[in-house]
């Protein structure tokens, strides 16, 4: 009897791992397709999905005065190194400005320029909404709510893993 339970448990674990593999592969495919089709949706405005994410982050009322490069990197969950190059290109294109933080001169704030706000609100937003409509057109509100719920659970678990890895790295550095 105990052997049957162990086999059933092993089979359930194998089935879960197979589903996990399929889930993460689909997430990978979705990320790639978001980059490809999302960029296509806003390329007429000279934007990529990464720039779309930066402008979206900076458009929030809570950060109307800008965000530090570090805070923006943490919010977008990207490295400061990757973000620095992206911000440089966006600054060159006139979408953002990088200014010293009045509260801490060592820190730099990234703010959306008037031109960047126009690109975001007037040019990009209608195309982004149309893109969302095409991608999620056959989703009910419940479908979107449940999908968001499960993606947030996955993201929280990934953050916990990342935080644990950062703690391990810090501990190793102290040795």
UniProtKB/Swiss-Prot annotation:
Family annotation (SMART domains): HTH_MARR
Domain of life: Bacteria
Function: Transcriptional activator of genes for the anaerobic degradation of benzoate.
SUPFAM superfamilies: Winged helix' DNA-binding domain
Pfam families cross-referenced by the UniProt entry: MarR_2 (PF12802)
Protein name: Transcriptional activatory protein BadR
Entry keywords, A to Z: Activator, DNA-binding, Transcription, Transcription regulation
One of the GO BP terms on file: response to stress
GO MF, any single term: DNA binding
Organismal lineage: Bacteria, Pseudomonadati, Pseudomonadota, Alphaproteobacteria, Hyphomicrobiales
PANTHER family: 4-HYDROXYPHENYLACETATE CATABOLISM PROTEIN, TRANSCRIPTIONAL REGULATOR, MARR FAMILY
Domain HTH marR-type span(s) in chain numbering: 20-156
UniProt xrefs under InterPro entries: HTH_MarR-typ (IPR000835), MarR/SlyA-like (IPR039422), Tscrpt_reg_MarR-type_CS (IPR023187), WH-like_DNA-bd_sf (IPR036388), WH_DNA-bd_sf (IPR036390)
